[in-house]
Design a protein with these regions (language model features):
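Short, well-ordered beta-strand elements
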Residues: 1-6, 49, 59-62, 81-84, ...
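Sec-exported extracytoplasmic/periplasmic mature domains
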Residues: 33-37, 56, 69, 81, ...
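Surface-exposed binding/hinge segments that line
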Residues: 63, 97-140, 158-165
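N-terminal lobe/hinge region of extracytoplasmic solute-binding protein
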Residues: 3-55, 86, 154
Length: 247
């Protein structure tokens, strides 16, 4: 349970409109490849079981893991990848539109294979495409993608929506049927049964919630508050850990 500052009126983090809950991206949705946080821009296969890139990086082929499923049980297929790219390219956020427009051609030789021909000159484009969120075509094709929504969207990630209370709090629940739970990249992760975010109007309100035990996790970015603001928590079951972040 974590206290955040702000509010939200949408659970779709892929569009320009509205104020979304950004955590939806990593908890509910997934990408073809998965990033390794302790290696510089290093990706490993996830929804894509294999990836094949030509020498000058102007073509890439992704092979979808046949075990990959959305949380409603529907299998992930090549058509979902094509739908995701075209939808985000045409209606997504500016970064999606910029990068995905560099895909000259996309084709599906079979239901698990996606081949893309790319504009030359961008050697990172293959990696960026690998981080593209995969959307379920059968859910989104009947919706107006560019409109904000508080509906409990379907993804393939380790968590699903439990409770959505606009502007107040949101709760995610671990999916016991998560398709990748036994894969090596998921071991030791996604250990919480529920994850809750409560929203406060200002930083002080969020801080007071933490001090009262209404929030169990807090990321402190204010040096002065870190130095003196936690003094009255001494003796309580609170662990303070300083992490050096290199930029």
């Amino acid at each position: 349970r974590e206290a955040l500052v702000g509010s939200f009126d949408s659970v779709n983090p892929f569009i320009i409109r509205g104020q979304p809950v950004w955590q939806v991206r990593d908890l509910v949705f997934e990408s073809l490849l998965m990033r390794s946080r302790d290696e510089p821009f290093t990706l490993y296969g996830h929804i894509a079981e294999t990836i094949d890139v030509n020498e000058d990086r102007t073509a890439v082929t992704f092979k979808v893991n046949p075990k990959a499923r959305f949380s409603d049980g529907e299998p992930i297929r090549a058509d979902d990848i094509v739908f995701s790219l075209e939808t985000l390219r045409d209606s997504g956020r500016p970064n999606h539109r910029t990068y995905y427009a560099k895909v000259r051609k996309i084709e599906t030789p079979d239901e698990l294979t996606v081949r893309m021909e790319l504009e030359p000159g961008d050697r990172e484009l293959v990696l960026i495409l690998g981080l593209m969120p995969v959307l379920p075509k059968h859910i989104f094709e009947a919706r107006d993608f560019e409109q904000t929504t508080l509906d409990k969207l379907v993804g393939s990630g380790p968590y699903t929506f439990d409770t959505v209370d606009a502007g107040d709090h949101i709760i995610f629940r671990r999916n016991p049927d998560y398709w990748a739970k036994d894969l090596p990249q998921a071991r030791g992760q996604y250990n919480y049964d529920t994850i809750r975010y409560d929203f406060y109007r200002d930083m002080q309100g969020a801080f007071e919630a933490f001090k009262k035990g209404e929030a169990l996790l807090r990321t402190e970015t204010d040096a002065s508050r870190w130095a003196v603001g936690y003094a009255d928590l001494e003796g309580q079951p609170v662990t303070l850990e300083q992490v050096e972040v290199g930029l």
